[in-house]
Amino acid sequence: MTIMRKNHPLLKIINHSFIDLPTPSNISSWWNFGSLLGICLMIQILTGLFLAMHYTSDTATAFSSVAHICRDVNYGWLIRYLHANGASMFFICLFIHVGRGIYYGSYMLSETWNIGIILFLTTMATAFVGYVLPWGQMSFWGATVITNLLSAIPYIGNTLVEWIWGGFSVDKATLNRFFAFHFILPFIIAAFALVHLLFLHETGSNNPSGLNSDSDKIPFHPYYTIKDLLGILLLLMILMILVLFFPDILGDPDNFTPANPLNTPAHIKPEWYFLFAYAILRSIPNKLGGVLALILSILILATFPLLNSSKQHGLIYRPITQVLFWVFIANLLILTWIGGQPVEYPFTTIGQIASILYFTIIIILMPIANMIENNILKLH
């Protein structure tokens, strides 16, 4: 078996990726989230496939087909809530994974990092089109508001919006194409994830110390397979607690009402994992400015390798940047909270301050902290 594992054309790839892969001996539990994202993607594809067998992407029957899945299909309620809450777990793992990359300086593996940003954007697109499918009030109005933002693009904006809608409003054509996108995108994510791994294994993993670990590597299996298995069990436990005890805690009550173009909900808001970006979008009074800020709130991650001038890898021995990092995380939580609040004082003001701080920390404060820390190093 050992010889076959190392010589067989297909098994050889699996062997070099998951079994005999030389891995730093000191990577902590923060490195578990990559494998957890893989598991989340598998759960989403499997549950999504079974949901697609019973779902109908027609404005007249979409809402009732979801109700039918929950009521009449064997374990349909379980599949549906695994899929809905699985998306939340996916994003929790995604945010922690990106946060770990920022904290430990993994962005210096620039190809892996850039593919990761593409993965992040693709996952956000998938979640957005997926949220439209149940055709509840928030699905419909969320789709209307967010797709309408494209009209802010000069000259081609309005044409682009109508092209995406497939008509003059969000209707049957929109729902149909969103279902098609939602079905295909996870497979594109899976393909990008393989490229992500390919680039990662080209350079080898980073580690908490930020030092070169070539002299101290251990095989991935059994050490990290067991460690990942523990993470997977914890993830599944949290997911099952959510699904079986609090299935609707992260959903919006408005989505239990069928979509009605004549009745606008009091507060239109996306799922919780988009609220930080939604708060940044709303904090700018100008439509085009808001759209640009929304896009930049994600694309700004690409500036991390460019703006980093530190002589050290990661933040483990950099107290000033460490403080900034945790202020950044707190600010992100504030933005998430603001995104779910109505557009009125004091929420708008807090949102504007938090949005400015979001960009200021990354573009101005962190590079300054880098220079200060480099100078402190020279003193010693």
UniProtKB/Swiss-Prot annotation:
Cellular component GO terms, alphabetical: mitochondrial inner membrane; respiratory chain complex III
Cofactor(s) in the UniProt record: heme b
Mode of membrane association: Multi-pass membrane protein
Residues reported to bind heme b b566: H97, H196
Gene Ontology annotations of biological process type: mitochondrial electron transport, ubiquinol to cytochrome c
Top-level lineage group: Eukaryota
CDD domains per UniProt: cytochrome_b_C (cd00290), Cytochrome_b_N (cd00284)
Binding site for heme b b562: H83, H182
Main location: mitochondrion
InterPro entries: Cyt_b/b6_C, Cyt_b/b6_C_sf, Cyt_b/b6_N, Cytb/b6-like_sf, Cytochrome_b, Cytochrome_b_C_euk/bac, Cytochrome_b_N_euk/bac, Di-haem_cyt_TM
Subcellular location(s) of the protein: Mitochondrion inner membrane
Keyword list, A-Z: Electron transport, Heme, Iron, Membrane, Metal-binding, Mitochondrion, Mitochondrion inner membrane, Respiratory chain, Transmembrane, Transmembrane helix, Transport, Ubiquinone
GO molecular function, one term: ubiquinol-cytochrome-c reductase activity
Positions of a ubiquinone binding: H201
Oligomeric and partner information: The cytochrome bc1 complex contains 11 subunits: 3 respiratory subunits (MT-CYB, CYC1 and UQCRFS1), 2 core proteins (UQCRC1 and UQCRC2) and 6 low-molecular weight proteins (UQCRH/QCR6, UQCRB/QCR7, UQCRQ/QCR8, UQCR10/QCR9, UQCR11/QCR10 and a cleavage product of UQCRFS1). This cytochrome bc1 complex then forms a dimer.
Known role: Component of the ubiquinol-cytochrome c reductase complex (complex III or cytochrome b-c1 complex) that is part of the mitochondrial respiratory chain. The b-c1 complex mediates electron transfer from ubiquinol to cytochrome c. Contributes to the generation of a proton gradient across the mitochondrial membrane that is then used for ATP synthesis.
Similarity-based family: Belongs to the cytochrome b family.
Note: Heme 1 (or BL or b562) is low-potential and absorbs at about 562 nm, and heme 2 (or BH or b566) is high-potential and absorbs at about 566 nm.
Name listed for the protein in its UniProt record: Cytochrome b
